[in-house]
Amino acid sequence: MDTKKEQERDELHRAIWAIADDLRGSVDGWDFKSYVLGFMFYRYISENLTNYINKGEHAAGNTDFDYIALSDEEAEFAREDLVNEKGFFIKPSELFGNIRKKAPNDDNLNETLEKVFRHIEESAQGADSEDDFAGLFDDIDVNSNKLGGTVIKRNERLVKIINGVGDLQLGDYQDNTIDAFGDAYEFLMGMYASNAGKSGGEYFTPQEVSELLTRIAVAGKTEVNKVYDTACGSGSLLLKAAKVLGKDAVRQGFYGQEINITTYNLCRINMFLHDIDYDKFNIANEDTLINPQHWDDEPFEAIVSNPPYSIKWEGDDNPVLINDPRFSPAGVLAPKSKADLAFVMHALSWLATNGTAAIVCFPGIMYRGGAEKKIRKYLVDNNFIDAIIQLPDNLFYGTSIATCIMVLKKSKSENSTLYIDASKEFIKVTNNNKLTDENIEKIVSTCYERTETEYFSKLVPNDAIAEEDYNLSVSTYVEQEDTSEKIDITELNAQIAEIVAKENTLRAEIDKIIKEIEG
């Protein structure tokens, strides 16, 4: 383990926790995240732009140049080029560092910030980056009563947030041993998600589960054309591919769709904080099942997803959907009350011939009857299911349910499905269970190599699955180890006989003593 890296990460996490602790009670956790993450993003793009400009000027011999000290008028000459190259423009006077200096004495700080955020978004209008910046600061409500009942109190709170974010050691680490901004984001999301319970789980897939899904989806590959998430939340799962493969190995970038506007904004912020250029991500704010985006895109070689469990959708109330090429091959739609398999069919439709999809699924879809059974039959009969993995319970924020992973492929070399029982692959950490690196490695290697291990994994021919009435539950195929104590009947009978003999001897001695007493 890299001790320096862990030490830096711990320092960063302690500092973030201190900000949250300082503001506790004024803005409740899950609402507060928008402010901290939003200001962290504002600081990041300010420093990113400044460093980019300074680096160019210093390389040209202008070693004393510092963009933050430039006048707005002088900087204006570079606006067009910067928008083309970086996707946005910030005047020197509106950079995070300069706003921070003036903030304690700015009686109209809320209005100043509102104007700055509007200017940043407007700088991208008409440019290729417009969609990536539009509405990005909408969730940072600088006039919210949650910050305080008066303008003075709200501004005091804003100064605290700005100083807290400004004090974070995000750019001073040598050798970039940690992805500081990105790591801070992930820590904050995890912290708030765990405290927010069920609502937090909608935004954030735990890092270990993200790691597992991603490694399954890219196993055997050193690069992919792009990565896609059907319900991308805050983007943490999408970005795991950048960590696992390296962001340059995701050649065309990161794609996703998210129905919740707040989460959609968080996802775009997350992309920027992980240093993903505006032209390397495409996140859409639409209903994936009813209004899918990326129709015309080249199919995806890696799909990872943790869609919402058993949500309602239009289903057969919408006559158009049964003819939708994503769903029509199965001949039936997922039930209106349970959209899980609609997300699976959507992912399969978007998947490249040489691609892999890894999707977290609610366990009920593996065995329920009706339309869901017909969709399972379609998937099995067409050999699209590569593996089903039973996960431990209590891995996710807000639910203790033991979920599964369904792995899809379109070009399998054999007509069989691998079943893995990973329900015992975890350690307990506070209120949740957690996958260790060893657990993840065991699952990924078993899945990729398709190895059979007693009580853990089994390769099942698809016709055997058909004989089981298309039940996909792991427990149907992977035998449970009998952990009950083995009893030796012969030995037990001998012990009983010995006890009876001792009892008879004692009775005889007691009778003898009683006779002597009565004597």
Which role does the model predict for each range below?
Residues 1-212, 216-217, 221, 279-291, ...:
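Non-catalytic, mostly N-terminal accessory regions of nucleic-acid modification and defense proteins
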Residues 2-3, 7, 297-519:
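A conserved structural/catalytic subdomain of Rossmann-like adenosyl-cofactor enzymes
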Residues 19, 183, 240, 255, ...:
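Residues within well-formed alpha-helices
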Residues 34, 197, 229-231, 252, ...:
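Short glycine- and Lys/Arg-enriched binding-loop motifs that mark or flank ligand-binding interfaces
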Residues 36, 181, 224, 251, ...:
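A structure-centric signal for secondary-structure junctions around beta-strands
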Residues 193-196, 250-251, 427-428:
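Short small-residue beta-strand/loop micro-motif enriched in glycine and branched aliphatics
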Residues 199-305, 310-312, 316-321, 326-331, ...:
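Conserved S-adenosyl-L-methionine
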